[in-house]
A protein has these predicted regions:
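N-terminal capping/small domains of soluble enzymes
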Residues: 1-76
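Hydrophobic faces of well-ordered beta-strands that scaffold small-molecule active sites
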Residues: 2-6, 17-22, 67-71, 89-93, ...
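Glycine- and other small-residue-rich loops at beta-strand/loop junctions that grip anionic moieties
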Residues: 5-6, 50, 102, 125, ...
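Catalytic cores of alpha/beta
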Residues: 13, 77-85, 127-139, 171-183, ...
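Glycine-rich phosphate-binding active-site loops on the catalytic face of alpha/beta enzymes
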Residues: 22-29, 91-97, 143-153, 187, ...
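Surface-exposed amphipathic alpha-helices with a cationic face
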Residues: 62-65, 110-117, 137, 170-176, ...
Length: 228
């Protein structure tokens, strides 16, 4: 499968892709456009941002079956989502964004999440620990999204710099765990797709390539080839 990663999934549509909308939090976090203008910058080897999940809040979202909804576990209140979302909604839990305060989601919370949404994917940090990967596999999660942006003092970096780190992570997870891997980070060319596929990715998440939409067709064609 091919995913359009947030924030692009909120606006971009493509017939061959699944939109991932969000990332949403239990409480409203205003200022998306302003934060994009203030922090989104082209840097050497990628893009840097410190958007920090600016969104209208879960209560103000109209959920649809044709999208996946990225939900952030920012604090212990995130469990409120169980009272707000139908079990038929497709979700991804984001536990590794560098632009917000960290919260260590617990094993009981992960068990509850998997019980309610067995097909939920988990998006993790590029610095995810073996212990956390062990917990995810033991709980029973099938899909893992590798990965969030690389943390820096000024925000998270995506693009080629992330790909270099992420390829190592995809290889490690593929060789040591039983997840279906969603790979994202620095996918701009057919070669990037092949690199991730050879490392063990089964699905692909497209993000800043949407800044250069003329690249997208060849990337998607290559994903279809490696997915046969």
């Amino acid at each position: 499968m091919i995913y359009i990663s947030p924030p692009f999934g909120n606006w971009v549509r493509h017939k061959d892709c699944i939109r991932v909308r969000g990332t949403f939090t239990t409480e409203r976090r205003p200022g998306l456009i302003i934060q994009c203008l203030k922090t989104l910058r082209k840097v050497d080897g990628g893009w840097r941002n410190a958007i920090g999940f600016r969104n209208p809040g879960l209560e103000n979202i109209e959920f649809k079956q044709d999208s996946i909804y990225s939900i952030a576990a920012l604090d212990s209140k995130w469990y409120k989502l169980f009272g707000k979302l139908d079990k038929g909604i497709n979700i991804e839990i984001n536990v590794g964004c560098p632009n917000v305060n960290s919260y260590s989601i617990t094993r009981p919370e992960l068990k509850m999440l998997h019980r309610h949404y067995p097909n939920c994917s988990v998006k993790v940090s590029p610095h995810v620990t073996n212990n956390f990967l062990d917990i995810l596999q033991n709980v029973g999660f099938k899909y893992i999204h590798l990965s969030n942006t690389l943390p820096t003092k000024k925000g998270g970096i995506s693009g080629a710099k992330l790909k270099k780190k992420n390829l190592q992570l995809v290889k490690f997870v593929s060789n040591n765990y039983n997840f279906e891997i969603i790979a994202g980070g620095g996918i701009y060319t057919p070669q990037d797709v092949r690199d991730y596929a050879e490392a063990g990715a089964k699905h692909f998440s497209l993000s800043t390539v949407w800044f250069t939409p003329w690249r997208v067709k060849k990337v998607i064609e290559e994903i279809k080839l490696v997915s046969k």
